Amino acid sequence: MTIFLQATVEGLSLAAIYSLVALGFVLIYKSMDVLSFAQPALAVVGAGLISSLAVDRGIPFWISLIIGITLTGVIGLIVERTFLRPMVGEPVFSVAILTIGIDILLRTTLDNWIGLNPRYMGDPFPTFGTFGSAEIGGVTIKYLEIAGLSTAILIILLLNIFFRVSKYGVAMRATSFDQEAALAQGINVGRIFGLVWFIAGILAAFAGFFITGGFNTLSQTSFVVALRALPAVVIGGLDSIPGAVVGSILSLIHI
């Protein structure tokens, strides 16, 4: 029973991380009808930015985290403006292939910038230790797993409020439902596309940190871990945010 509970805790932690990547997949698909294969690369880029700022430049970790996550969102926005905006009206398959090229470009740029060697992410809790853990009923729970699960739940709740209450959230929902109708109502669809990619970049950066934090490091395999969120999206539904979260429970099978 203890082994089962331990596997369940670790599986839920992975599911939380996968859900952050999966939400980015879904947001982009709902707004643009395109499956973006660049999400895993954005996760790795986000982790690389955080590591570079915190470890290489000695910037306090929490400041590095905020800057790294924000910059990843900006990179997502730049990707949409530079590569995807000119592709509006092109076949969906062509745009999806383009996102594969963007994925390769982002990862190659990151490798040339910070190198291929595994990298430490920095310690957000120097007093307690990122590698610390608590034991409850014979089950060991790492602090980083608790942080990852809590962060994912908080982000999902905030996104739900954002989509229901805020002006831009409602505009994003309208755009995902019918772009032409949204345009007729005066919604700036191009701005919504940019916002979607900005949010997707932020979600990916959070996931990238939790994938590479703790005992893990930022390496070539980090991309593969982020890519495992894709099956969860396919099973949960490419246009379903709740489905992306539920589908991420597939990470339990990985355990």
Put a short name on every predicted segment.
Residues 4-55, 78-94, 173, 233-242:
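Single transmembrane alpha-helix segments in multi-pass membrane proteins
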Residues 14, 136-218, 241-246:
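Helix-loop-helix "hairpin" substructures at the membrane interface of multi-pass membrane proteins
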Residues 18-22, 42, 46-50, 64, ...:
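Alpha-helical transmembrane segments in multi-pass membrane proteins
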Residues 39-42, 214-241, 246-247:
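Glycine-rich helix-loop "coupling/hinge" segments at transmembrane-helix boundaries
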Residues 58-102, 109, 246-251:
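Alpha-helical transmembrane segments within multi-pass membrane transporters and channels
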Residues 74, 100-116, 145, 157:
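Mid-bilayer segments of alpha-helical transmembrane spans in multi-pass integral membrane proteins
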Residues 104-135:
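Extracellular/periplasmic helix-loop junction at the C-terminal end of a transmembrane helix
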Residues 253-255:
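Conserved small/polar residues in nucleotide/adenosyl-binding loops
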